[in-house]
Amino acid sequence: MTKKYDLHCHSTASDGVLSPTELVHRAYAQGVNVLALCDHDTIAGIDEAEIAAKEVGIELITGVEISTNWEGRGIHIVGLNFDKTHPKMTALLQSQKALREKRAVEIGDKLEKAGIPNAYDGAKALADGEVTRAHYARYLVQIGKVSNDGQAFKRYLGQGKSAFVKAEWADIPTAIETIHAAGGIAIIAHPLRYNMTGKWVRKLIVDFKAWGGDGMEMADCGQTKDQRQMLARWAKEFDLQGSVGSDFHFPCGWIELGKNLDLVDSVIPVWEKF
């Protein structure tokens, strides 16, 4: 039987809406055999997910999505199959947590100046862990300032908007080095979703490979066949393995755990390293 993999999803430990247990149960219902919980800069949900995975018979891979800065842009690096207790990983995630909290407070201050008081407290009430921009977006929807999360980013939270705060995340080499030190595999998350031209995506891949990166996500729920073929060509050129991930945050019509996550045949799957 061919296994179904989903190696990128989120829980309430970061900006997802399902608890780790609920997420695992949903993955099981969708026929996923191997799952990686990759919350933003935290592994706080993994212990709970491991218990649920054993109950339903899913293989759970340790994962995290590390926020980094590259060429003035935010780029996410997924770590897979690493030692979650490794001191270097623990130290990096603690540092990232402090940076995220600092940014969250600053976003709240900017929203207050924009005439939206107590936004930090409102966002925090919606968070089960660290406060992210997604929690602010949900709060702005809740109080009627915007009609949906996307509008919150376009009006307040996105780059160049009144409540945007640039975070000074780790750089990509630090993320890769930390993942490798913990025995894991470093992956570029959703390389075609950074609003960059093909030239810039290729430059990102060149730098990532030069710094020792292992692979990139090459299948998500919404990619076209042409996009997957393009990523497959780059994977071959730079000797990178392919990962797959829905980047599931909440139930919706167009993104689902395990949905449409097939690698191009020529790509070497990252799970061969597991």
Curated annotation (Swiss-Prot):
Mn(2+) 2 binds at residues 15, 40, 249. Gene3D superfamilies: 1.10.150.650, Metal-dependent hydrolases (3.20.20.140). SUPFAM superfamilies: PHP domain-like. Transmembrane segments: none annotated. Disulfide bonds: none annotated. It catalyses: a ribonucleoside 3',5'-bisphosphate + H2O = a ribonucleoside 5'-phosphate + phosphate. Its EC number is 3.1.13.-, 3.1.3.97. Mn(2+) 1 binds at residues 8, 10, 65, 247. Its cofactor is Mn(2+). InterPro entries: PHP_dom (IPR004013), PHP_domain (IPR052018), Pol/His_phosphatase_N (IPR003141), Pol/histidinol_Pase-like (IPR016195). Keywords: Exonuclease, Hydrolase, Manganese, Metal-binding, Nuclease, Nucleotide-binding. Mn(2+) 3 binds at residues 65, 76, 190. GO terms for molecular function: 3',5'-nucleotide bisphosphate phosphatase activity; 5'-3' DNA exonuclease activity; 5'-3' RNA exonuclease activity; metal ion binding; nucleotide binding. NCBIfam families: RNaseRnm. Efficiently catalyzes the hydrolysis of the 3'-phosphate from 3',5'-bis-phosphonucleotides as well as the successive hydrolysis of 5'-phosphomononucleotides from the 5'-end of short pieces of RNA and DNA, with no specificity toward the identity of the nucleotide base. Is more efficient at hydrolyzing RNA oligonucleotides than DNA oligonucleotides. This enzyme can also hydrolyze annealed DNA duplexes, albeit at a catalytic efficiency lower than that of the corresponding single-stranded oligonucleotides. Belongs to the PHP family. TrpH/YciV subfamily. This is 5'-3' exoribonuclease. The lineage of its organism: Bacteria, Pseudomonadati, Pseudomonadota, Gammaproteobacteria, Pasteurellales.
